[in-house]
């Protein structure tokens, strides 16, 4: 990743805690109309994981009988035989989840690594010629498993800071202050140390 190269080159992690990571697996399902409730949200933690393994799930009912279901597992798990994919499959067979998926069909799927360090892992965000935003900056609200709104806000604040200093050929340090004064920073502070 370019971000990791930049963080090392400009020592952007000098004053923050190390980033932690998880793997997120997500599927999109088309389910039976009788199993669908538009707008319904289900979040879980734990099962089928053991008590030493951090993780949880989400299930979001969209319109047109579509459901997004996902499972996130912290990558610091101790069991070398643990398979995030297998844990996700087991999770989908829990009666409280299976009832939504029965008779449905999976339309798409994907997986990705997630930054989960949160507030205490936010690096220095600026360096000569650039700014870290979104996921690269570690902006993720872990309990809500949401980061798109934070990525968008950081991009907007970056644009403002760049616009204000576009004629200067210096590091845009204003951006870090804009982040610290924004609701983004407050939101991450409230869910720190999770």
What are the roles of these predicted feature ranges?
Residues 1-102, 138-139, 154-157, 161:
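Predominantly flavin-linked oxidoreductase catalytic cores and closely associated redox partners
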Residues 16, 79-82, 121-124, 142-150, ...:
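Alpha-helix capping and helix-loop boundary segments enriched in small/acidic/polar residues
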Residues 27, 31-32, 109-113, 177-186:
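Short, conserved secondary-structure transition motifs
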Residues 71, 134-136, 179:
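Active-site proximal loops enriched in glycine and acidic residues that flank catalytic Cys/His/Asp
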Residues 99-110, 168-174:
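Flexible, glycine/charged-enriched surface loops at secondary-structure junctions
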Residues 111-142:
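FAD-binding beta-loop-beta segment adjacent to the flavin cofactor pocket
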Residues 138-144, 156, 160-194:
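Active-site-proximal substrate-binding core of FAD-dependent oxidoreductases
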